[in-house]
Amino acid sequence: MQPIFPHFLYGGDYNPDQWLDRPDILERDIQLMKEARINCVSVGIFSWARLEPEEGVYELDWLEAIIDNLYKNGIYTVLATPSGARPLWMAHKYPEVLRVNHTLTRNRPGRRHNHCYTSPIYREKVRQMDLKLAERFGHHPGVILWHLSNELGGQCFCPLCQEAFRNWLKEKYKTLDALNAAWWTDFWSHRYTDWSQIEAPVPTGEMETHGLSLDWNRFVTHQTVDFARMERDTVKSVNPAIPVTTNHGESYEGINYYKFRDVVDIASWDSYPLWGKDPDDVRVGQETAFAHDVIRSMKKAPFLMMESSPSATNWQEVSRLRQPGIHMLASMQALAHGSDSVQYFQWRQGRGASEKFHGAVVDHYGGSDTRVFREVSELGDRLAHLDAIVDSCPKPEAAILYDWENGWAMNNAQGPRNIGMGYLQTVMAHHASFWKRGIPTDIVDMESGLTGYKLIVAPMVYLLRADFAKKLREFCASGGTVLGTYWTGVVNDTDLCYLGPTPGNGLAELFGLRKEEIDSLYDGQYNKLLPKENTLPKPEYRLKELCELIRCSTALPLAEYGSDFYAGSPALTVNTFGKGKAYYLAARGEQELLDDLTDRLIKEAGLTPALDAALPYGVTATVRFHETSAFVFVQNFNPHPLTLPLNRPYEDLETGRTLSQLPLKKFEVRILKATR
């Protein structure tokens, strides 16, 4: 789609509904926004009680005055639907809109995210509210994007959701016999004989039927996505030209975000890294890069960073201030990974309630002569000169598999490591190896296409769907390189174990081996991986937590275990499959092993780094492409300066100078331009 704006969106959550009795503050907001070069704000996210103070009584004039005044001053509006928190009158008149928690107790009114996505009454009230907003503002020239609800998520166990779950299961399985077979309910004599017997998994009920828990998580995602789709259809019924987004949280495991890819026009998320927690911020930079890549990969297009803090939060365990330079670094990192915006929560600090101490562009002092406002203004000035980058996007040659349903199944599997299988952490560790080398990666799930990639890294694909197994085999046979790992191809999509050789569904043939056993080590216990000659640069690597015992058929062993009763058996293999190669890492190593193995894979697959230079610790590079240009973001996460020799000349996008070496200040990001 066409970019919604010719500039990077710059602004944040604006809550004028909290200041309607202070017109002087609303007027001052406009002055300060101009001073900081704000061009866009998100309005109305939690304004429902002001928009509909009584049932059926809509008061939108104040909102129109706000949007008109913003537009008159060159500031555009991302207009939110206020379904993230409903007014108290609704909860008291219609208790069914409130969630029932996992103890099967209905919540009291209060908080936010305390509503049932299934409730027909809530859906109708949301639809009516959204339609009023769309009819009033759907053709307003200042409204450029719809912001659906806020940080969708959570579960409800009310009777309405239970019945909707049963209907969802009927649609999926058709018969109870099929459901019982898929869930293996003869175990413990839990066979269902009537649909009404099925209940959502709760601690006081059924929790060990793994297919039930897996399908419940799928259903929760389905209801949440369906709710968002209802909101999208409502606002677009008036003007389908205005795109929609909904803001996600970071790596929230309760909802499969990728199911939103066909609902929203633009993916977005809220970024709140724990800057300052470690001795340096390199690990935080790696983890944040992964989160950016997850959201960008949802649509494989530019995304929006809808929220971030310009200083501290107030809801994390410790509210550390961003050190000087970190604000610019964090904001430019978002752009580096494909964001077309830097948005804050919040524009102005409120005077009361739970986020009164959350960081904001304008604090309780209310002036522009603060460190935070100065840094925000500096970023605004910089963004105003980077229009050439807008709507460009990374085009990675490598992809890493992260699949929500696989994670749900693995975390509920009861073995082999009940103190934590570490699925997400393992995926992020593989991602970090590429990040440190300046190799861009997409994050894909099992529904994603694999066309266009040279390398697929698929860690711990415990739940292996048949269609993905087929795609992976075809990818490798056509010349692609694949890395698989331990605990792959164990169960099917209803969490039933594969019979016969595993990895199942043809992956035993792809990797040229079969798994026999898996050893789970206690914390503090280790094994060794001993590479064969010319395989990896070090003579040994430490292994921990999970060690799989495999038997090779056509695979060539590249390394073996160094201790325990399985010493000498294969720990790393490669198999030629069609025109490609399939590597298999049978044990969990530390980052050093993944880094060195990644170097081999990068060379084998012929991946192109974002920057033609050797990257030292704490420095990475990412690249965004237009048709004829490449914009390379070189990011220094170190608290000290350094100079980076370049293997070829680059143009500094912001100065126009040609560089053969690149000086970097601490926490600095510089943007280089190259011709494709």
Language-model segment annotations:
Residues 1-25, 30-40:
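An acidic-aromatic substrate-binding cleft motif
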Residues 19-35, 126-132, 249-260, 323-331, ...:
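Short, acidic/polar
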Residues 195-198, 261, 272-676:
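Carbohydrate-binding surfaces of carbohydrate-active enzymes
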Residues 27-105, 230-238, 462-463:
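Aromatic-lined substrate-binding rim segments of carbohydrate-active enzymes
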Residues 6-10, 37-39, 71-77, 139-144, ...:
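Short, well-ordered coil/turn segments that N-cap beta-strands
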Residues 10-20, 46-61, 108-127, 149-156, ...:
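The substrate-binding groove and active-site-proximal loops of carbohydrate-active enzymes
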Residues 91, 100-290:
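Polysaccharide-binding and catalytic clefts of secreted carbohydrate-active enzymes
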Residues 12, 33, 41, 70, ...:
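Conserved, mostly hydrophobic/aromatic
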